[in-house]
Every structure is written in C-alpha cells, then in structure tokens.
C-alpha cells in the first residue's frame, strides 16, 4: 500500500502520514476527536509535535493514548510543553537528522529554531513534502508572542534548511494553505527586508 498524507483542519493543520494500516500524526492540534476520526481504525505508531505550543500539542496525549503511541518533541521546547501538559513528558526527544519510518517512507527531522527554540520540520523525500509547523506559512513567517521567537534564527533556519530542498517540494504548514519551496524562495528576500514586524502572528500557535 502506498503512503499518503491526510489533513485535518482545526486550530492548526494536522498532517497524518501513512497508509491503510499505520500512521504518524504530525501536530495533533486541539481536537483529538477530529484527528482520530480521520485516522479511523489505522494504528497510530507515533505522534510528532513540530513544537510545544498549545495549538499544536494540546491533543497529543489523547491522540497518542488510543494506541499507546510514543510522543516526540524537541527537548528545547520542553518548557512550552509543560505549560500545556504539566509533568507528563514526551517519550522521544527529537534531534536534528533523526528518522521516523511509517508505511515504507522516512520522515527526517530538521531542527529549525526561530518560531520557538525547539521547532522542527519533517522532510519526506519519498513524498516530496516538508511539514514545517510554524517555521513559515504561505503568507510569510509565523511569529509567537511568548517571548521565545527569534526572527533572525527563523530566517536562518528557513534559508539553510527549507530553501535548500528541491524547488518542487510541497511545504505543508501549520496554518493556511500549502505551497512549494520555489514559491517560498521567491518571497524570502522580501521577508528579510520587511523585518519581524511583517510576520503573521499565529495567536496560540
């Protein structure tokens, strides 16, 4: 069975990567019922949070709990995770270059600090996609008002880790519609010139 990516749109975009047997849920968001309804009777083998903000991670325990799946988060976002889930810690500390496998495809962890210190992207060469959380969106960068965003680091992460991917790669963001690396590359210089005030706020992102 071929791997595919399903989407649930609620507070954020949730991406479900897998086939008819097993899936990995990326950014479970806030609505566990909606995510699990989309998953159906497939086994959740992992839940990955691109960062620890409430909008992306609130439903992690409920989604993972159904099939006792491990939850993965970069350790640099542990503080924001604890603001949502208290003393319940993630099971896997992600690091740059880590690999998750599902349905015959690999998801590579790309540490992309900026929106938060522990933000990551997940690149799947087999499916020509990168799931980028709040690293960027179709209309620009996504900022956070929690005091942990770093605009310069965010630009650096995008330039070094996203724009270097093949131009046809589909970018699946945490908010809004998908786009391609080629489209992001055309906008990059304008983001630099405009500065941090031009970035789109993400609310509880």
Regions found by a protein language model. Name each.
Residues 1-42, 121-133:
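Conserved beta-strand hairpin/beta-sheet module of binuclear metal-dependent hydrolase folds
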Residues 9-10, 30-106, 187-194:
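Active-site HxH/HxHxD metal-binding segment of metal-dependent hydrolases
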Residues 26-27, 104, 173:
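Small/polar loops that bind or transfer phosphate-bearing groups
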Residues 24-26, 46-49, 111:
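Short catalytic-loop micro-motif centered on adjacent basic/acidic residues
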Residues 23, 111, 117-205:
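Metallo-beta-lactamase
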Residues 3, 10-12, 95, 117-119, ...:
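Short beta-strand-initiation
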Residues 5-7, 91, 111-113:
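Short Gly/Pro-enriched turn/cap motifs at secondary-structure boundaries
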Residues 1, 16-18, 97-124:
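Core dinuclear metal-dependent hydrolase active-site scaffold
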């Amino acid at each position: 069975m071929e791997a595919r990516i399903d989407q649930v749109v609620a507070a954020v975009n949730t991406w479900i990567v897998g086939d008819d047997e097993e899936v990995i849920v990326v950014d479970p968001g806030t609505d566990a019922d909606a995510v699990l309804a989309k998953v159906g009777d497939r086994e959740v083998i992992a839940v990955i949070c691109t960062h620890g903000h409430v909008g992306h991670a609130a439903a992690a325990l409920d989604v993972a709990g159904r099939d006792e799946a491990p939850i993965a988060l970069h350790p640099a976002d542990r503080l924001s995770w604890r603001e949502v889930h208290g003393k319940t810690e993630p099971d896997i500390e992600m690091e740059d270059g880590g690999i998750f496998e599902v349905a015959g495809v690999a998801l590579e962890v790309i540490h992309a600090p900026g929106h938060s210190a522990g933000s990551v992207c997940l690149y799947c060469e087999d499916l020509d996609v990168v799931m980028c959380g709040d690293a960027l969106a179709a209309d620009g960068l996504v900022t956070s008002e929690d005091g942990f965003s770093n605009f310069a680091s965010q630009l650096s992460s995008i330039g070094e880790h996203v724009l270097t991917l093949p131009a046809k790669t589909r970018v699946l963001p945490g908010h809004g519609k998908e786009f391609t690396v080629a489209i992001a590359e055309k906008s990059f210089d304008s983001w630099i010139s405009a500065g941090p005030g031009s970035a789109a706020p993400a609310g509880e992102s």
